[in-house]
């Protein structure tokens, strides 16, 4: 298996639907050709939570080694890839969602004040989450809960997933170091 992309490496997979623009998936590196997924990008935000093993993860030229319990935020339009380390498999949860799921409608205060500053900051292509740091551990717990909800699908699970994504976004916004260097400048 490999990610389907266009000529510019944009992933062609739909991440959810218009009505619920969220895709939550259980992934395993060994399912990909040569234990890696190719460089690609998409306009959606991606959150990855490592369940077991390790993954070599690259985002816009930065390389990370994520181990069991770690996670990463990959910003919209960021070029990213992942691979096995020393031939060992990695199992992870990928939550990919459209930014509008956070803010609702264009030009809302939530979009302009809290979402766009993160999305457009060139230095915020990625943020690694470690269980050793309190606020990041809270983010990781939210990521795991999102996956659990996607499996059990109790009444109103979609709203609970939205609530959890907003909780994650609040933590990212509060703790991000903004460079002021926008993609739009």
Stretches with model-predicted labels:
Residues 1-67, 71, 77-78, 112, ...:
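Generic protein-terminus/edge-of-domain signal
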Residues 2-23, 79, 83-147:
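A hydrophobic/aromatic-rich effector-binding and dimerization subdomain
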Residues 34, 57, 104-105, 180:
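Short acidic, gly/pro-rich beta-turn/loop elements at beta-sheet edges
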Residues 126-136, 150-185:
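Short, Lys/Arg-enriched, Trp-marked, Pro/Gly-tolerant hinge/linker segments that flank
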Residues 34-41, 83-85, 105-107, 157:
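Short histidine-centered beta-strand/loop micro-motifs
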Residues 26-28, 119, 172:
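Hydrophobic aliphatic residues
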